Structure formats: C-alpha cells, structure tokens
Amino acid sequence: MKKLFLVDAYALIFKYYYAFMGRPMRNRAGMNTSVVFGFTKFLRDIQKREHPDLLGVAFDPKGGSFRREIFPEYKANRAETPEDILLSVPYVKRIVEAMCIPVLEVPGYEADDVIGTLAHKGVEAGYDVFMVTPDKDYGQLVCDNCKIYKQKGNDGIEIVGREAIREKYGIENPQLVRDILALWGDASDNIPGVPGIGEKTACKLVQEWGTVENILQNADRIKSRQGEKIAEWGDKLLLAKRLTTICLDVPIDFREEDLTVCAPRIDELKALFAELDFRMFLNDLTNLAPAEPLPEGPRSSSVGLTGSVSGRSYLIWFTGCLAETTTASIPPPSTGSLFSASASARVTAVSRLHTTLRPSSISPRRAVFSACVRDLS
C-alpha cells in the first residue's frame, strides 16, 4: 500500500528545543542549531527508513486560527516563543524547501487541521497515512489506515494505531479522544476542562456514556457531584469539544502531484549545512552520486504555484548503496493551479523522491544529539 507522511512542523520544533535545552548545539557563530539539526535528521531518517510515496510538512500560519476567534483565551497562557525557536524556524523552512519537500500552510487553520484534512482524504484515496507528531490530540484521527508516527529514544519509532488508543484511553472509537480532551481540558492550549475531572475520570465517563453531547444529556444520571459539575459546565464543555476537534474540511485539495517530492537542490543544502556547521549532512551531500542529472525543484512562493506539473521518479542512494535512477511512467503534464481557487496553501512539489541515506560515522556532534534525543520519548 502506498504511504503518505504528514509532518507537524511546530510540534517537532518545540519538542527538539526542549530536548536539547540543557546542552544545546551551536555553530561557530554561536547560533543554537539544536532544533534545526534534530528536525533535519528526523526528516532525513523518515525518507531513509520509510521511503514515503507522498510527503508534506505543515506549518501553522501567521495570524492564528479560527479557534482564537471563537475563544480569545485560546493559547493565551503561553509564554513568548523563545528567541532560539524564532531564529530556527526560517532555517527549518529553508531546508525543507531546499529538500523540495512540499510545505503546507493554510491561513486561518493550524497544522493539525491541514494534516487532519489531508489524512482523511489520503485514506479515502487508498493510502496508508502516518501523522508525524508527538501531540496526543491527533489520536482522534487514528483509524485502520491512519496512524501517529512518533520518535522513540534515539533511533526508535513508535506507531500509534487503534490498539494503542484502546490501551491508553479504554475506548474502541478513537474519535472519542476529542471528547476526553474536552472533559479533561488541555492546559497547553488553555482549554479549561470540567472542574474536578482529570484524565482518568474523563476516560471513565467517555467509556460509559460516549460523546460529550450524550454525557450532557445524561448528566442527571451521573453519580456524585460530577454530574452537577458537568451540567453547570454545559456550553463551556461544548465549546471545549469544538476547540479540541481537528478539522477535516480545510480548503485544501488532496492531489498526488501536490505532495510529491522532487530532487533536492544540492547547492542550497550545502550552503545551509555549511553555515550551520552540519558536517554529517554535508558529507552525505558530498557523497551523493546520481547516475544522471536530476531536475531541480521549483522555488517556493508565498502566493502559491501555478503552471505545469510533470516529473520523473528518482531513487537516490548515498554512499554504501548502489546509485541508480529509474524513470517512472507519468501521466501527461497538467496545467493550472496546484490547488483549487479556494485553497490558500503553499506547496512545493514536482516529482517523487525516494531517498535512502547512509549511516554516518559517529561524530562528536552526533554524540551530543544521541545523548539529548533519548529524552524525546
């Protein structure tokens, strides 16, 4: 079955920032490069390990989302974004774009919503979908062909499917994760839960009664003070569910040509990795030896891309593997917007890339990374 990988950029960016906080990596200019290194390595490892047929990296847009409009206190409790993250994000984007991996960004919607919509459509199109994120709210999207893909330890991976959701929450229907979160609340997003109800109680209530709506209808049948508190919370509980629900109707089309990855722009990557002092990645690029010239991917555009879409499928092996290039059968180029007129997503995509990367020798920089990344699980 073909595989679609969708990466929640900011979820990983914050995770790597805090994982490396005690001993950050820095380049010769003194810049904290931990986030960029961790993100790049994990993205590279996904390509090496999984060979995704389709791949996209979703970013939260500037200006917030519709959730702030319906609940002004949404995420209002968060401290200012650390300066090291603010400095790292542009580099992460530049590297993703130079790798010619599609960048997904829709005004008014968070990355969760973009990923949720594309994951839903991807499953309908017959793909095995993997959502690359450590965030628990993605559990509501899990189904037979849609799973959470998480880093575990240094090089380990945890796949969260139906069984894992069942074991964690005691529910058969993963969609009910949003109801558990609504009852419990989400402190990181400043979504208040019902007073006195924690995770365990929320799970028990949902196991017995199902959705938040049904729980409210039967609040008078719930023993002790819990039923009274739930009834009093009323509209706040319904609002919390709306806030914790990941959208599946973001105005973005699912088209394979919009989520394919073309040949990386090697010169750009070399310049970026040299500036960041990423010797391990520079060595990989130096040893890249395609059998024939590869087409360069398109430059990104903040207003979207239009024009013809065509391409070839390349299998690129790094040192230690056979270098070969294969031509795939591709339908005639299509002309027009990469997205429908209603979609405001930015996407960089032309042709598919399956990348296998050779294991690099252990360097002091990698040793620091290995020591820090153990905290990620």
List the model feature ranges, each with a label:
Residues 2, 22-26, 76-253:
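Extended two-metal-dependent nuclease catalytic cores across DNA- and RNA-processing enzymes
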Residues 1-56, 60, 66-71:
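Non-catalytic, usually N-terminal nucleic-acid engagement modules in DNA/RNA processing proteins
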Residues 6, 32-36, 47-50, 88-99, ...:
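Basic, polar low-complexity surface loops/patches
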Residues 299-302, 308-321, 325-377:
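Low-acidity, Ser/Thr- and Arg-rich intrinsically disordered low-complexity segments
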Residues 255, 259, 264-314:
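Long, highly charged low-complexity segments
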